C-alpha cells in the first residue's frame, strides 16, 4: 500500500490532533445516531469532534474529524460538517487526498469493496463483514490505486445513486480488470440504504458478485 511521506513532526501533530478530537466524540452522539452509528463504532475509526482546535485547525471547529490511519500512523484528517455546513467536507491545507481504511487491503482475500466517501466505508466495516476502502469523493480517484486493488480477483464498487456515482464506478472499471458495480437507487448511498433496508440488502448483492455461477 502506498503511503504519504510526512515528516515525524507532521505525523506527531496529526496523532495529537486525532487523540484530542477523539476524546470529544460524545459531542457528535446525536449526529452519529442519525446515521445509525454508535459512539463505540465511531471510536473504532478514532472519529472525533474539533471542540478545542489545535493551532491551524480553527476553521474546522465544530466539525467531525475523520483521521486517515495506516499501519505507519495517521497520515491525514478530513473534517465533515454536522449541521449542513458548506462545504460539507474540508481537508487540511496542502494535503493530498488518499485512500481511506487501507488496513482492509491487508485482511481482504479474493474481493474488496470500494465506496465513494469515508462514512460509507465506515458503515460497511462496522455493519458488515465485507473488507472495504473509501475514496474521498468521485473526483479523487488516482491512477496508483490500481496497483493497490489489482491483486484482488473482484473489486466491487458501491456507487452512489447519482450521475457522479455512476461515473465513479465507470472510471474504476476502465482502469481495473474485474470490477462489479453495485449502484444505489436514485438519491441514495450506502449509509442511507443501510438505514432503510439494513445491511442484508447489500450482503445479498455482494454475494451475487463473489459467488461463482
Task: For the regions a language model picked out, list residue spans one by one.
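Acidic beta-strand-to-loop metal/phosphate-binding motif
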Residues: 114, 152-164, 183
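Hydrophobic anchor at the start of a short beta-strand
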Residues: 131-132, 155, 178-181
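TOPRIM metal-binding catalytic domain and adjacent DNA-binding surface shared by DnaG-type primases
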Residues: 1-65, 69-71, 106-107, 207-213
Amino acid at each position: 500500500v502506498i503511503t504519504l511521506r510526512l515528516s515525524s513532526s507532521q505525523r506527531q501533530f496529526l496523532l495529537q490532533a486525532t487523540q484530542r478530537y477523539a476524546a470529544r466524540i460524545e459531542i457528535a452522539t446525536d449526529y452519529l445516531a442519525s446515521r445509525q452509528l454508535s459512539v463505540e463504532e465511531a471510536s473504532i475509526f478514532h472519529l472525533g469532534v474539533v471542540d478545542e482546535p489545535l493551532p491551524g485547525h480553527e476553521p474546522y471547529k465544530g466539525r467531525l474529524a475523520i483521521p486517515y490511519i495506516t499501519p505507519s500512523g495517521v497520515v491525514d484528517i478530513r473534517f465533515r460538517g454536522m449541521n449542513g455546513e458548506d462545504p460539507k467536507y474540508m481537508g487540511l491545507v496542502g494535503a493530498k487526498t488518499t485512500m481511506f481504511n487501507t488496513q482492509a487491503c491487508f485482511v481482504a482475500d479474493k474481493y474488496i469493496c470500494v465506496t465513494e466517501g469515508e462514512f460509507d466505508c465506515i458503515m460497511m466495516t462496522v455493519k458488515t463483514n465485507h473488507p472495504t476502502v473509501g475514496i474521498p469523493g468521485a473526483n479523487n480517484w488516482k491512477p496508483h490505486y490500481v496497483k493497490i486493488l489489482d491483486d484482488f480477483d473482484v473489486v466491487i464498487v458501491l456507487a452512489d445513486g447519482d450521475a457522479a456515482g455512476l461515473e465513479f464506478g465507470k472510471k474504476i472499471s476502465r482502469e481495473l480488470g474485474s470490477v462489479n458495480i453495485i449502484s444505489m437507487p436514485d438519491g441514495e448511498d450506502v449509509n442511507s440504504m443501510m438505514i432503510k433496508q439494513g445491511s442484508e440488502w447489500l450482503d445479498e448483492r455482494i454475494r451475487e458478485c463473489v459467488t461463482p455461477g
